[in-house]
Amino acid sequence: MAKATDPAKQYNSNPFTLSFSALERFFKSNLVWAIIILAFGLFGFLFQATGSMADTSDKPSGSSSVSSSHDAFNNIDSGVIITVVTVAVVLMLIFIVVGGVIQTFLTGMFSYVINQSEQGRSVSLSEAFHATTKRFWRLFWANLLAQLKIFGWTLLLIIPGIVAALRYSLLPYLIMNESEKEKGVVDSHTKLKTVVKGRLWEVFGVSTVAAIIPFIGGIVGLAGRGALYRQLQYSYDHKTKRPKIHWLNYLGLVLIGLLILLIGFIISIALAVIIASR
């Protein structure tokens, strides 16, 4: 049951005010967690930037390096190649499994903290860890099933894949909001689809806010999606009327359209220059 002061009671369809209000509540209730997530974002940004610079500086030049690499490869014994490939595959599988476990724990803990922040509760590391441990396998398999659905729909048709990705971005909040006694994996997908029905544009709106804000966009999206899920769940449980979808939720479409026009304009200018130079 939601508290009298629960923000979920006041349905807010504006993705900007919803997300930043949720971020404010997050900082007020769990400042340490907010700093930790910001640190994760900074680390990821620096890692990506460093990787990009390394890729640029380490590009091989000339055909001689390609031919010498080809000759060296031909001189290697086939048994050594098989061994190296086998070890590489095993290591890759280990990294995938370990990465999946770590990602599940982080997703579960962050989602749990956001859910509790929306209720004005402070959460310790121990509480978040144990809450995630109790729901780990349900969260792990539910997320895996969601990724398979997103991948499958994207292969068939891009738009359904995007729709699935938007919907299942709220899945961790649902699982971490429910009792640890709940075990259904498919059931979590069914519940989420019912709760989010007709409001996917709001999920798109929050994702747009997160995408266009530099550096802190990740934590803004994390808080915004948590707040959106809770008000969707509250309105569904209490059968309250949801307001009209705010026009700012469509801002992402406008930005995508402008980007396409800009790319088209640049290509047109380039073609005109090429044709004129002939």
Describe every region a protein language model picked out.
Residues 2-278:
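Hydrophobic alpha-helical membrane segments
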